[in-house]
């Protein structure tokens, strides 16, 4: 049996040369990223960052891998189905970069954000849990952390919410302001989903790329979120790029409102100007009303 050569971080990142300088590579190696939700988008972002050479991660996810995850979650395989996502993902990362420093958090991680966030200025939100996401955003503002996220949309998207930016619940008009995240009911959660869906319809071509009946079920909480590998993995890749920019102090063309990447037309869709958005919102409200009827 051939002996495996010893791992070399420098050799692993050799092909990064030209994209980042040696000094920037050292910055990535010393960088820290908190990823909550390491399934689809979060898992894709995480794998890209590991292979880019980021050296320190804190990971949180309460779920186990299921067969239905295998259509888009990079760490879901026949070997990991039935295993806790955090443990299985850590094992996979160790097979890529055994020098990566991994800190894991249990089901109570939301309660420990005051301890987690001071050490992380870059956070990737890969969760579907809306209430936990609201708690994350509130605490990120307090601790000066930037949250990279994406919309619930059939198109790849990415948002970068810096500490001074409005939270999604403020910007999108969620009915959760002033409510403890633990007290967010399913009805409130569905109202938040509807508010997000309205923004997505107004500011992107998403409505042209999804089955409306299925989307209505998602908003109503009667259907699980549809996920397609190219969309999910592309979204995770966009998130990883934004994390790299933040770690390296590079400028980004993405703000708290985000952008959509339409792979069907190869266009970048940005927030629409106010007069156009005003007209489209009225159309979108009628569309949502028909969808929910």
What are these regions (language model features)?
Residues 41-42:
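Hydrophobic/small residue at the entry helix of a nucleotide-binding pocket
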Residues 119-230, 263-293:
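E1/E1-like adenylate-forming module used to activate ubiquitin-like modifiers
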């Amino acid at each position: 049996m051939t002996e495996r050569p010893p791992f070399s971080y420098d050799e692993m990142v050799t092909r990064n040369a030209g994209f980042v300088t040696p000094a920037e590579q050292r910055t990535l190696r010393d960088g820290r990223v908190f990823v909550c939700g390491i399934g689809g988008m979060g898992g894709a972002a995480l794998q890209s960052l590991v292979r880019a050479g980021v050296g320190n991660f804190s990971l949180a996810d309460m779920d186990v891998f299921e067969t239905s995850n295998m259509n888009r979650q990079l760490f879901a395989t026949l070997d990991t189905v039935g295993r806790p996502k955090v443990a299985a993902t850590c094992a996979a990362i160790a097979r890529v970069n055994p020098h990566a420093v991994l800190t894991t958090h249990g089901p109570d991680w939301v309660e420990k954000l005051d301890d987690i966030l001071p050490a992380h200025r870059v956070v990737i939100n890969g969760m579907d849990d809306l209430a936990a996401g609201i708690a994350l955003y509130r605490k990120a503002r307090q601790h000066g952390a930037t949250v990279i996220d994406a919309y619930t949309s059939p198109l790849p998207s990415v948002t970068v919410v810096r500490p001074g930016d409005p939270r999604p619940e403020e910007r999108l008009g969620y009915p959760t302001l002033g409510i403890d995240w633990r007290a967010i009911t399913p009805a409130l959660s569905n109202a938040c989903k509807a508010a997000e869906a309205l923004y997505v319809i107004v500011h992107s071509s998403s409505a042209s790329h999804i089955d409306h009946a299925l989307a209505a079920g998602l908003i109503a909480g009667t259907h699980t979120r549809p996920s397609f590998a190219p969309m999910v993995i592309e979204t995770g890749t966009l998130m990883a790029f934004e994390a790299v920019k933040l770690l390296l102090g590079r400028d980004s063309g993405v703000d708290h409102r985000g952008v959509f990447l339409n792979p069907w037309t190869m266009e970048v869709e940005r927030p629409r100007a106010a007069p156009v958005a005003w007209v489209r919102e009225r159309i979108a409200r009628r569309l949502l009303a028909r969808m929910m009827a």
